[in-house]
């Protein structure tokens, strides 16, 4: 399979080509604007007139469904943080351990449901489509909760827990098996005292394409890997065309996604941030609404009594 390479996008800034944390970039988001507003009525006026809305979502949206974020205090699986296991190097060293981690995450997700934030976004997209308006969701999440909520216009820039990619033939396929292979049944416990399963590589998930049988890996973007250039081209197009942008449940610290909304704001497009706390990018935006996305988004995206305000 050919390695992922960055696309030459207008808006997607050569420095931030792979999945990176702020420590690895040493970069600050550009200087601040005036203090953002929390006036919902003002936001609703802009929302009523917007024709092309981009919603950028992150882990905070799914956290309200009980999805582990593996960030901050207590953000460990066994003794590991996500960035310890979500790398090509970790998979090459110990594919059994990495597959245990992703098996655990897959099994957790099978018990979770979209929350009111996901549902508000999906309902808004469907309603605005009938009005000839467009909503595009660009998510950093790999849990498919937006898809399960009913969102149709969706770019999953970091991949999906429920897709695999063959390390031999490169085939990408949906995979909702539980467990994904017999050897992982009952494995993946997150307890720090749990013993690593040490599953032989031949017993790990394997490609089912005729004549292949190669080792499968999760079809997600790991730290140090480039994002899919075709998806980045789509992101570039959406960010260029949008006339309103929402940033929901994202910490604005993982690049390149951390640059998406500030770049939109820099060209004068209103950006509204919905988050439990401020982020390094908050003062770059027109609005900031603090609180659970499952509470703030249904209010922000609710239908107007008179439909689209002209």
Swiss-Prot record:
Q: Which residues cross the membrane?
A: none
Q: Where does substrate bind?
A: 102, 105
Name the protein family. Belongs to the sirtuin family. Class III subfamily.
Q: What is this protein called?
A: NAD-dependent protein deacylase sirtuin-5, mitochondrial
Q: Which residues bind Zn(2+)?
A: 166, 169, 207, 212
Q: Where is the Deacetylase sirtuin-type domain?
A: 37-307
Q: Where is this protein's transit peptide?
A: 1-36
- Name the major location: mitochondrion
Q: How does it assemble?
A: Monomer. Homodimer. Interacts with CPS1. Interacts with PCCA.
Q: What is known of its domains?
A: In contrast to class I sirtuins, class III sirtuins have only weak deacetylase activity. Difference in substrate specificity is probably due to a larger hydrophobic pocket with 2 residues (Tyr-102 and Arg-105) that bind to malonylated and succinylated substrates and define the specificity.
Question: In which organism is this protein found?
Answer: Canis lupus familiaris (Dog)
């Amino acid at each position: 399979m050919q390695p992922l390479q960055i696309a030459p996008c207008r808006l997607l800034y050569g420095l931030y080509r792979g999945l990176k944390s702020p420590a690895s970039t040493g970069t600050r988001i550009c200087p601040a604007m005036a203090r953002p507003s929390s006036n919902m009525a003002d936001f609703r006026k802009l929302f009523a007139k917007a024709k092309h809305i981009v919603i950028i979502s992150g882990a905070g949206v799914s956290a309200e469904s009980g999805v582990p974020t593996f960030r901050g205090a207590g953000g460990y699986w066994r003794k590991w943080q996500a960035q310890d296991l979500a790398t090509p190097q970790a998979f090459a060293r110990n594919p059994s351990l990495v597959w245990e981690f992703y098996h655990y995450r897959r099994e957790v997700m099978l018990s979770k449901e979209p929350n009111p934030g996901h549902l508000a976004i999906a309902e808004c997209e469907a309603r605005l489509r009938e009005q000839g308006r467009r909503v595009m969701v660009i998510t950093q999440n790999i849990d498919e909760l937006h898809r399960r909520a009913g969102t149709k216009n969706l770019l999953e820039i970091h991949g999906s827990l429920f897709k695999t990619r063959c390390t031999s033939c490169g085939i990408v396929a949906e995979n909702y098996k539980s467990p994904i292979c017999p050897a992982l049944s009952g494995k993946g416990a997150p307890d720090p005292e749990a013993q690593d399963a040490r599953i032989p590589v031949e017993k790990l998930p394997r490609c089912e394409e005729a004549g292949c049988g190669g080792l499968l890996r999760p079809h997600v973007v790991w730290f140090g890997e480039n994002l899919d250039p075709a998806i980045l081209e789509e992101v570039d197009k959406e960010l260029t065309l949008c006339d309103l942008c929402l940033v929901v449940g994202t910490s604005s610290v993982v690049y390149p996604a951390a640059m998406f909304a500030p770049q939109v704001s820099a060209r004068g497009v209103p950006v509204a941030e919905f988050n439990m706390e401020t982020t390094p990018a908050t003062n770059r935006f027109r609005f900031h609404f603090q609180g659970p996305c499952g509470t703030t988004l249904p209010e922000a995206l609710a239908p107007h009594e008179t439909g689209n305000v002209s």
